[in-house]
Amino acid sequence: FVNQMQEGYYKNIVNAFLSKYETEFYRHPAASRMHHAFISGLAQHVYEMLKIAAVYCDMYEMLNRELVYAGIILHDMGKLFEMTCENLVSTEYTLEGLMVGHISMMVSLIDEMSKELECEGEESILLKHMIIAHHGKLEWGSPKEPMIAEAELVHYLDVVSAKMTALETAFK
């Protein structure tokens, strides 16, 4: 999916994060209990979301595919620092994970990476909004609710992937 992205900020920042954290990204669970709580769960969760997003981006031309893909790939990457995954089986929350959370942690990481890439404009703000809004509602842990179509889509795809995998696990 990254190869389908047009050259520019979103592709550059995604490539920078994947290059830096590739091993952790592909082996880390997406959660400790609720969904994708298994080895490589984070990568599977992201892949499921990207597959569905591709259909929506084809269907709705107003969507910025690069922003959607970048938002999906990075939305839970803060979990690499929110939870430990020492033995690839059990996860525990780090102190920073408990006190700050993966959303705030990822926004800080995007700020740092954007500075390194020398791109801190509107695209960076939109990407941070994707991260901040992906839980959808304030009461579900989002500091802001989605304010653009791309953020709304990422929120719903996050919910669908999480719920379907939880149901699939329950029925096994």
What are these regions (language model features)?
Residues 1-97, 137:
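Acidic/His-rich, divalent-metal-binding segments that scaffold phosphate/diphosphate chemistry
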Residues 55-170:
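Divalent metal-dependent catalytic cores for phosphoryl transfer on phosphate-bearing substrates
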